[in-house]
Every structure is written in structure tokens, then in C-alpha cells.
Amino acid sequence: MKKGINIWSFPMGTIKDSLSLAKDAGFDGVELALGAEGELSLKSTDKEILEVKKMADDMGLSLYSLTCSLCWDYRLSDDDPAMRLKAKDMIKRQLECAKLLGADTILVVPGVVNVSFSHPEKKVAYDVVYERSFEGLSELRPYAESLGVSIGLENVWNKFLLSPMEMRDFIDKLGSDYIGSYLDVGNTLYCSYPEDWVRILGKRIKKIHFKDYRVEAGGLHGFVDLLAGDVNYPEVMRALYEIGYDDWVSGEMIPNYKYHTDAIIYNTSYSMDRILGRK
């Protein structure tokens, strides 16, 4: 497996600063994110995106996956048809940017019933979210296939697709090799176990986030450093070997440290080496 890290794990700075730190800490690649503004955004030109790719290439780093900070603002399941259209347009641009960066996967939040930390006033019925999300992803499927970039649906605290069996069946119903799971092992622990998700989703897993979570803490405060929480990483690794997973695993460390913020990158790299059996 290849060891990467998500860009949101880094202290504030430029993309170049983050890539340099990732390289120094021993990562093989970085998962970047599109934003509304900034160096890499929905407004970035193809030329600007290719310059980011060259920067990473020059450092010997892969840009293997692309997420987007606007996924909670523009939702495939929104009550407003105009917002659903914006969500589809955003995902199309995310696919295009991923192709330019050399990434083979984008992270997508499949739909949102409700979420406490972003627009908590919005609540959409579960069956309606299912219908709208399925419709939107079905429309996006041919575009992903034409670019050769996969859409990875993340299990996240969106009160939707709450079990690995439901995620599996949703993916299978979409019927494309270019739509699969972006499995976040830490996000599963509030109601299930990541090793079950791994074994049930199997070949449908496109990419994986490594996080850790302390169940007794609860809420967003439960997220802790790798190996400091309740994720049974030895069992997760056994499950990954069983299904033959040999793709990227990305540390996603949120929140960052308050002081000596670069230390989280080095600590995460070491913990991932231990988890992966490199040390």
C-alpha cells in the first residue's frame, strides 16, 4: 500500500510548503482539495492546475486523489434544484481537475440528510436523499467514465448510507467500475467497525482515509492521533490484506495541533509506518 496524507492535515501555508513537509516526513503522495478560492480552486485554470502537478512531480510526490471543501455547501440531495445543479457542476470540475493532476479518484459526499457542523438547519428526508443522490450520481457516471477518474463515496457523518451493506448495495445499483467507496475508517466507529466495512465493501473500495477515534469522548472531540483511539488497526490491516487492497491510504488529521503544528505530520507518518508494517 502507498502512504499519503490529506492536505487538511497541514498547518496554514502554501501548497508548496505542504508538499515539502510531506516529502520530508516520508509520505509518498498528498491528497489535495479544491476550495472556493486560493491556489487550487474551482476558479483555477487548467494551466494553474498543471503547475501544481509539476511542483509535485519535481518533488517526487504523487497527487493521487482530490477532495473538495465545498461538499457540504453544494449537495446532490439539496431541496433547491439550483443547488443540486451546482453540486453536479462542482463534481464535474473536480473530476476534470483530478485528471489534470494525475489523480485517479475524487472524494464525494453522496448526499446529506442532516449534519450538525454545516448548515444544521437543513434536513432532507432519508428516502428523498437516496433518490436525489442516486439520480445525480447516475448523471455523473458517464463523465467519470469518460475521464477515467473514479468517484469515491465517503462514509461520513451525513446520516445517510449508515451501514456497509447499504453502501455496498447503493454502489452496486449505480453499476459502474468508476463509482465506489472512499472508506474513512475513523468515521465508522460511532456506529460500527471499520474492519466490517472493509470486508463487506471489498473490491468496491477506491481509496482509504486513516483516522482514529475515541468512542467514549463522542462527537467531533473524539478524533485523536493515529493509534490513540479505538480503531483496531491490526484487524483493519488483516481485512485489507484479505480483500487484496493495494492502493493509497491517506492520513487525515483534523483538528491540527495548536502548537508546533508541523509535528502532526511527522507523528502521522511514523504511526502509519507502524500500521503498515514498515517499522
Regions found by a protein language model. Name each.
Residues M1-N6, Y64-L76, V112-E121:
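N-terminal small/glycine-rich loop or linker at the start of catalytic domains
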